[in-house]
Amino acid sequence: MVGHLHLQGMEDSLKEQGREGLLDSPDSGLPPSPSPSPPFYSLAPGILDARAGGAGASSEPPGPSEARAPPSQLPNPPASEMRPRMLPVFFGESIKVNPEPTHEIRCNSEVKYASEKHFQDKVFYAPVPTVTAYSETIVAAPNCTWRNYRSQLTLEPRPRALRFRSTTIIFPKHARSTFRTTLHCSLGRPSRWFTASVQLQLCQDPAPSLLGPATL
């Protein structure tokens, strides 16, 4: 049984050895030439024998009784460990607000019209804490046990009027004299209250007789 071995990079060297063999034959009439040293890329004898045996075995077809060896199956790589995914399912938060005011605020408001002045004095305001702004952020990273949430609650004492008493002073629409009622009230300082009374009467004189303002 003869096998054929094909090696890459050695075809040229085999052709040169064949030519040298023809020159070394006794019919050529030339002295034999020394055999060249094997090339540095020549394979080891064990590798050549193994390849020659494999090539010879491949030339013969396998018998019917011989079973083909199953191809080698590579082991499956280990599946990457899947971490549990964190998703916000339920989130609850309780907020407790104490509505009791710490102190009262007293102020006076003044409304001006074309021919009258309207005062609202003794107005009591209580700072009731009410929710004016609320924001919430929940961050749940996938495949991670890290969670972060932030809640921001803004409370402002929005004043609400509890009780007040109004006083209305009406002047004539075409009054020629100026009557003024002044009301001063400042927090933390002694307050002064001024009240003016105006009495009007009908007369024949074009210039109406007016009584001066009386300070009570």
Swiss-Prot record:
It is found in: Cytoplasm, Cytoskeleton. Disulfide bonds: none annotated. Residues 12-22 have a biased composition (Basic and acidic residues). It holds the Pfam family FAM101. InterPro entries: Refilin. One of its GO terms (biological process) is negative regulation of chondrocyte development. Residues 1-83 are annotated as: Disordered. Residues 57-71 have a biased composition (Low complexity). Belongs to the Refilin family. Interacts with FLNA and FLNB. Involved in the regulation of the perinuclear actin network and nuclear shape through interaction with filamins. Plays an essential role in actin cytoskeleton formation in developing cartilaginous cells. This is Refilin-A. It comes from Homo sapiens (Human). The lineage of its organism: Eukaryota, Metazoa, Chordata, Craniata, Vertebrata. The gene is RFLNA.
